[in-house]
Regions:
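Carboxylate/His-rich catalytic cores and anion/metal-binding grooves
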Residues: 2, 6-32
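Active-site glycine/GP-rich loop and adjacent strand/helix microenvironment
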Residues: 25-215
Length: 215
């Protein structure tokens, strides 16, 4: 059917942001820092309002978010599956609805990342019983945005090669050696587990981020 994704709003669920008492510098979760630096026009496409989304106290933030987002026409979700599920259940509690499709009939996409989605899939299908609902995974960290799922028919993710990150891949079987090989993208093989090493335009040089990938 026809998509209404851009006709509604994106529900963004991030962390908290505050100012350091000594220096006045902004500090907080990466998601909150990114949110605080998005252009103002993006707020028109998003819910909840920025001042609510960046609240530091979760006990204050959760019910306030649930009240505010339940009144919006939400078509997409973006966040970590565990925390998003808590919010969705709070929305159902506030609205006294049976499932999320009764609150947001036009909801069709959840862009998730941060943790393995597999243990949450059935829980989401119960809360959002909709055939049109799609789930797309992203792979990012404080060090950079690395990959995202670009097709609904495969769980593979597309590696981003033009986003200021140079990748090297160390075979896990060689990781404990004194001089393991660090392979470029053109040298990797399918079916092999690799430790990810990155150099970035943010200043990281051959930094091992602690993740493993397989092509």
């Amino acid at each position: 059917g026809d998509s209404r994704m851009f006709a509604g709003k994106s529900l963004r669920l991030g962390g908290s942001l505050q100012k350091d008492g000594g220096t006045g510098a902004k500090c907080g979760d990466l998601s909150a820092i990114l949110m605080s630096n998005t252009p103002k026009w993006a707020d028109m496409c998003s819910t909840p309002p920025r001042n609510t989304a960046l609240l530091a106290d979760w006990n204050e933030k959760l019910p306030r978010m649930a009240e505010e987002v339940s009144r919006a026409d939400v078509t997409t979700l973006a966040g970590v599956p565990s925390w998003m599920l808590v919010l969705l259940n709070k929305v159902l509690e506030v609205t006294e609805k049976d499932d999320i499709t009764q609150v947001w009939p036009n909801l069709e996409l959840f862009m998730h990342g941060g943790i393995n989605f597999a243990p949450y899939k059935q829980l989401y299908e119960k809360v959002i019983p909709s055939d049109k609902m799609r789930y797309y995974e992203t792979y990012n960290a404080s060090e950079g945005f690395f990959a995202f799922q670009d097709t609904p028919h495969s769980k593979d993710m597309l590696l981003l090669t033009d986003h200021g990150v140079f990748y090297e891949f160390v075979p896990m079987a060689e990781l404990d050696r004194e001089s393991p090989r660090a392979l470029t993208l053109g040298e990797v093989e399918t079916g092999v587990n690799y430790a990810v090493v990155i150099s970035t335009n943010g200043g990281l040089w051959r930094y091992m981020i602690g993740d493993t990938v397989r092509f």
